[in-house]
């Protein structure tokens, strides 16, 4: 069996139990065997991975190593990778090969990590089930008839199925945390601006944030150590200094106060999911943490506000895909208008078109004040709610999703039902706060996820809370059988 965690791989490489090439070959063989069913990867970079693994082994033998040297990872296909196709799960970019490397993937290359490939995703990161991909849906490895979550479903399913040690994702309204919950993983959405967006194809620029998928909070801390930091090439990148996110993992929880937002424990929450959360609360209490009920009164407005702001930003960001400069171009256009119309009609899927139309409507002259400006005012109220609550407590504990993974096709005919899947993840995104998703139980053989939300730039505290919980539970150690 492959080692499950980055920490185990680091130890194995250091102790010469295996080489980076050997472990990379094992992962590539597993991808060949399981990816045809799960559809986690859009592109597998076998030659690149083996070359990087050999270089990592050479560095290791020369004593020139770094923390992630030789560790095989996968990247969501929204990060530009020089010389490697970056599709964003869309026909529009099916053949797009970026001429440069994103900051995130560049940092992992510089850290010595091995790139196994690019993972499947909802088209342009728009979706909550990974059913919107031009390259077909991803299947949840816990039950292949169910969704892995979205939009980073390929990354989540790949890590859960053991096709890679960890993976990158992006989170606009829950696209790391929701798949982490559905697939039984640890997933971190950092504070907005903590991770560079350079080379991360934009969906909603004021919300998009890159982050890691891993099996443990400790692994997520190791990954964030590489990903985080100011990037002068990204105008939204935070100037706040980074830290060693592993340094506080062992800190005891005595004296920590955790808030329970009463609006999240509502009748929308499945009873068995709530029971799992109550058991998690007991674990934290046994570790010395105390709990306090808090209120986030504008929570119910988060989904409608988000589905004005995010589509508005997407409608402007995706205007660049016009068939002229790059991306899909229709055949034999009769004039410029025909080129624009047919290239975009052919290149974009239904959900992307829906959101472009919603966003264009919200930004139109007659409706800008009624919709977009109002949504931004609500966003400020939601942020103020969090600021007030987090002045009283060290972090918030709440569900990630209302229920466990739903069946493929179950919600595709009703966009509103699909949008409501993000009801517990969107608020932290609108506020720009860091949030950590963790597995905390099972319901009917499917993972249940919980979410820890912290104040700005308190990722180390969230990872400490996650690590201490995982030292005292084993939910994160469970893996889907996959016929093994």
Curated annotation (Swiss-Prot):
Keyword Transferase: yes or no? no
Keywords assigned by UniProt, alphabetized:
ATP-binding, Ligase, Nucleotide-binding, Protein biosynthesis
For this record, the Gene Ontology CC terms, alphabetical, are: glutamyl-tRNA(Gln) amidotransferase complex
Known catalysed reaction(s)? Answer: L-glutamyl-tRNA(Gln) + L-glutamine + ATP + H2O = L-glutaminyl-tRNA(Gln) + L-glutamate + ADP + phosphate + H(+)
Q: What is its EC number?
A: 6.3.5.7
* Species this chain originates from: Hahella chejuensis (strain KCTC 2396)
What taxonomic ancestry is recorded?
Answer: Bacteria, Pseudomonadati, Pseudomonadota, Gammaproteobacteria, Oceanospirillales
Q: What class of enzyme is it?
A: ligase
Q: Subunit comment for this entry?
A: Heterotrimer of A, B and C subunits.
The protein's matches in PROSITE patterns, at most eight in alphabetical order, are given as: AMIDASES
Provide the gene name from the record.
gatA
Known role: Allows the formation of correctly charged Gln-tRNA(Gln) through the transamidation of misacylated Glu-tRNA(Gln) in organisms which lack glutaminyl-tRNA synthetase. The reaction takes place in the presence of glutamine and ATP through an activated gamma-phospho-Glu-tRNA(Gln).
Question: Which residue positions are annotated as catalytic?
Answer: 76 (charge relay system), 151 (charge relay system), 175 (acyl-ester intermediate)
Its family remark reads: Belongs to the amidase family. GatA subfamily.
Sorted alphabetically, the Gene Ontology BP terms of this entry are: translation
Q: Which Pfam families match?
A: Amidase
Q: Which protein is depicted?
A: Glutamyl-tRNA(Gln) amidotransferase subunit A
Q: Which NCBIfam families match?
A: gatA (TIGR00132)
InterPro entries per the UniProt record, alphabetical: Amidase (IPR000120), Amidase_CS (IPR020556), Amidase_dom (IPR023631), AS_sf (IPR036928), GatA (IPR004412)
Is Metal-binding among this UniProt entry's keywords? no
Q: What Gene Ontology molecular-function terms does this entry list?
A: ATP binding; glutaminyl-tRNA synthase (glutamine-hydrolyzing) activity
């Amino acid at each position: 069996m492959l080692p499950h965690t980055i920490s185990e791989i680091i130890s194995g490489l250091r102790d010469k139990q295996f080489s980076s090439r050997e472990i990379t070959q094992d992962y590539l063989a597993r991808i060949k065997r399981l990816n045809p069913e799960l559809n986690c990867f859009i592109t597998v970079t076998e030659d690149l991975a083996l070359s990087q693994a050999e270089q990592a082994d050479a560095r290791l033998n020369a004593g020139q190593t770094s923390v992630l040297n030789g560790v095989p990872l996968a990247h969501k296909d929204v990060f530009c990778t020089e010389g490697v196709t970056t599709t964003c799960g869309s026909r529009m970019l099916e053949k797009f090969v970026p001429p440069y490397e994103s900051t995130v993937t560049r940092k992992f290359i510089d850290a010595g990590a091995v790139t196994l490939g690019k993972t499947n995703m909802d088209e342009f990161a728009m979706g909550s089930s990974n059913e919107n991909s031009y390259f077909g849906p991803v299947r949840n490895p816990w039950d292949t008839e169910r969704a892995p979550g979205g939009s980073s479903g390929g990354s989540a399913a790949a890590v859960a199925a053991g096709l890679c040690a960890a993976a990158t994702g992006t989170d606009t309204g829950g696209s790391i945390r929701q798949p982490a919950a559905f697939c039984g993983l640890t997933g971190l959405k950092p504070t907005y601006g903590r991770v560079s967006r350079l080379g991360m194809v934009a969906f909603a620029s004021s919300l998009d944030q890159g982050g890691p998928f891993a099996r443990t909070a400790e692994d997520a801390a190791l990954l964030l150590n590489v990903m985080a930091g100011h990037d002068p090439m990204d105008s939204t990148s935070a100037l706040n200094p980074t830290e060693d996110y592993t340094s506080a993992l062992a800190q005891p929880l005595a004296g920590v106060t955790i808030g329970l937002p009463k609006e999240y424990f509502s009748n929308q929450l499945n009873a068995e999911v709530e029971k799992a959360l109550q058991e998690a609360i007991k674990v934290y209490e046994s570790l010395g943490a105390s709990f306090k009920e808090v209120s986030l009164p504008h929570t119910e407005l988060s989904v409608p506000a988000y589905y004005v702001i995010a589509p508005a930003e997407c409608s402007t960001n995706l205007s660049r895909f016009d068939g002229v400069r790059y991306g899909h171009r229709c055949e034999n256009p009769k004039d410029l208008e025909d080129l624009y119309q047919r290239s975009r009609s052919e290149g974009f899927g239904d959900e992307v078109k829906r959101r472009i139309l919603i966003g264009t409507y919200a930004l139109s002259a007659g409706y800008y004040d009624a919709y977009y400006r109002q949504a931004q005012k609500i966003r400020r109220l939601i942020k103020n709610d969090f600021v007030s609550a987090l002045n009283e407590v060290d972090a918030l504990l709440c569900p990630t999703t209302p229920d466990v993974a739903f069946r493929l096709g179950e919600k595709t005919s009703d966009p509103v039902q699909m949008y409501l899947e993000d009801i517990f993840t969107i608020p932290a995104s609108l506020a720009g706060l860091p949030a950590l998703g963790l597995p905390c139980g099972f319901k009917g053989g499917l993972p249940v996820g919980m979410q820890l939300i912290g104040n700005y730039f308190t990722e180390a505290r969230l990872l400490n809370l996650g690590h201490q919980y995982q030292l005292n539970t084993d939910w994160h150690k469970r893996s889907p059988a996959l016929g093994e």
